[in-house]
Amino acid sequence: ERRCRFIAEKQQSCRPSSGLDGAFLIYDNEEECQFYDPRYDYNAGRERVGMGLALAAYLQKWPDSTLEKALHRYADFVRRELVNPDTGEVYNDYHRDNSYKRLYNAPWYARLYIEFFNLWQKKEYLETACKILRFYYAEGGSRFYPIQMPVAELIPLLRSNGLTIQADALMAEFLCHADYLAANGTDYPALEVNYEQSIVAPAADILLQAYKLTGVQSYLVSARKQLDVLELFNGIQPSYHLREVAIRHWDGYWFGKRKLYGDTFPHYWSALTGLALRDWGRMTGDVASQQRGEDSLRAVLSLLDADGRAHCAYVYPITVNGASARGADPYANDQDWGLYFALKTL
């Protein structure tokens, strides 16, 4: 609750004359102010959607008129500045700026519209979510490794709300995507970085979703091969920084204020491994994997403070290039994905 209130009170832009009105922005915990920069990892779109997701998930459990008002204002911002509900195109920043086209963005905003539907029960949100994913596939998304693709959640909702034609079309595209990832195996492409945990995790996730939707055993077998690789990024040291936390590098540099290189333990995307382990455990009855998944999901919550503040990453090395490093970065940026995962699963 404290984190959600902090987002609504401190991180929402409330400037009716600005295109940023309603946006959830970075918060500088040192300067006590919001921060916006058009540089990709500091802008008003992209991963910052995690704040909206966290509020939407929270409100489904604990209704609150003040927080819901903030979320409505954010929904207006998203529709006006970041998503075209007619075509499904998702923009990289406000002003519908798509000068940099990024496939990662689409599944996240489709997920946001699914959560809008779960909260407000308007079928138009499902239609928008479906359009976003259909647009994603039209742009070549079946050859990509997207983070947090929400198809296994969306397909049943489409069918139960009379959108069977849309569900069938999306299902066909999704299974082609899963087949491609299965055939690709461990021959991973270089994406925004050459190789990382969040390239392997989406492959495992999509194959597990395909198995959940179809019951076809070969998808489960292919997912296991991905999990065997994914587990290699994790350790089980007796520290909440290092127990079932996937090693990640430079996230403090890309998303933080300090701009420090170095391993981050944790960064919220570490929890992607936890989600995959949890799903595998639930589908196969593997209790140990379920517990490992829960440990991973809980570890990223250490990026949230008791007073509602938050930190985009924890840089673990004591020094980096001669500079003092170990500690939580001052920027509250996009770490609320971790809170969203917890609200949905723990």
Predicted regions and their residues:
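An acidic-aromatic substrate-binding cleft motif
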Residues: 1-79
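Carbohydrate-binding/catalytic loop surfaces
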Residues: 20-41, 87-107, 149-164, 187-209, ...
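Well-ordered alpha-helical scaffold segments within catalytic/enzyme domains
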Residues: 48-65, 108-122, 138, 149-167, ...
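Flexible, surface-exposed loop/gating regions in the mature catalytic domains
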Residues: 93-96, 115, 126, 130, ...
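Extended, well-ordered alpha-helical scaffold segments
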Residues: 2-10, 63-81, 120-139, 162-184, ...
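Terminal, non-catalytic domain-edge segments
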Residues: 176, 180, 206-346
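Active-site acid/base region of carbohydrate-active enzymes
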Residues: 19, 62-91, 124, 141-152, ...
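Long alpha-helical, hydrophobic tracts
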Residues: 84-163, 169-177, 189-192
